[in-house]
C-alpha cells in the first residue's frame, strides 16, 4: 500500500476554506502519491476508500463539465459503472447518489459503446442531443452536487485514517 501523507497545517487551512478545498488536499495528495494519474497498476496500491475518493473526483469533474455523456466518452464509464463505486458510496451514506448511479449504469450498458466511439468534435457535441436520456441525471447531479460533495467530505473527515497519514 502506498502511504499518502498530508501536512496537518494544509488540512487545517483547507478546512477553514470550504469542503472542495478540504477534499482537494486528500485528492491531490493521493494523486501525487501515485504519480499523478490513477491506473490499473497503482490502483492496487490504494485502499478502497482512496480509490472511491478518486472516482468521486472523476465523476464530479466530468459530470459538472459535460455530463454523463462526457464521462462515458472520456473512457470512465467502466471505472464508474462496472465496479463497486456506487455500492461504496451507498455505504458512505450517499444513498441517493448510489441509486442514481445504478440507474445511469443501465443507460451506460445500453449506449456506452455508441458514446465511446471515436468521433469529431462536432459528432461529440451532437451526442448530447442523441442521448437525451442522460439529461435528467445530469441535472440531478448538478442540483445535488453540493450536498453530495459535503457528504463525501464528512465521510473523509470522520475516517481520515482510511485516506492519509497526517504529518506535523
Segments and roles (model prediction):
Residues 1-69, 73-81, 88-168:
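Extended, alpha-helix-rich binding/interface surfaces that flank or overlap catalytic cores
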Amino acid at each position: 500500500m502506498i502511504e499518502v501523507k498530508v501536512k496537518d497545517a494544509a488540512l487545517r487551512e483547507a478546512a477553514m476554506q470550504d469542503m472542495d478545498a478540504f477534499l482537494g488536499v486528500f485528492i491531490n495528495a493521493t494523486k501525487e502519491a501515485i504519480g499523478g494519474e490513477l491506473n490499473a497498476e497503482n490502483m492496487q496500491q490504494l485502499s478502497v476508500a482512496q480509490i472511491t475518493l478518486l472516482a468521486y473526483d472523476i465523476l464530479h469533474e466530468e459530470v459538472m463539465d459535460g455530463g454523463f455523456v462526457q464521462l462515458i466518452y472520456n473512457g470512465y464509464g467502466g471505472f464508474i459503472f462496472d465496479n463497486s463505486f456506487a455500492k461504496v458510496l451507498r455505504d458512505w451514506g450517499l444513498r441517493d447518489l448510489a441509486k442514481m448511479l445504478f440507474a445511469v449504469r443501465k443507460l451506460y450498458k445500453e449506449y456506452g459503446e455508441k458514446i465511446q466511439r471515436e468521433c469529431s468534435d462536432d459528432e461529440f457535441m451532437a451526442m448530447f442531443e442523441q442521448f437525451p436520456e442522460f439529461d435528467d441525471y445530469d441535472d440531478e447531479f448538478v442540483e445535488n452536487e453540493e450536498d453530495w460533495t459535503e457528504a463525501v467530505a464528512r465521510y473523509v473527515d470522520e475516517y481520515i485514517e482510511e485516506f492519509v497519514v497526517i504529518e506535523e
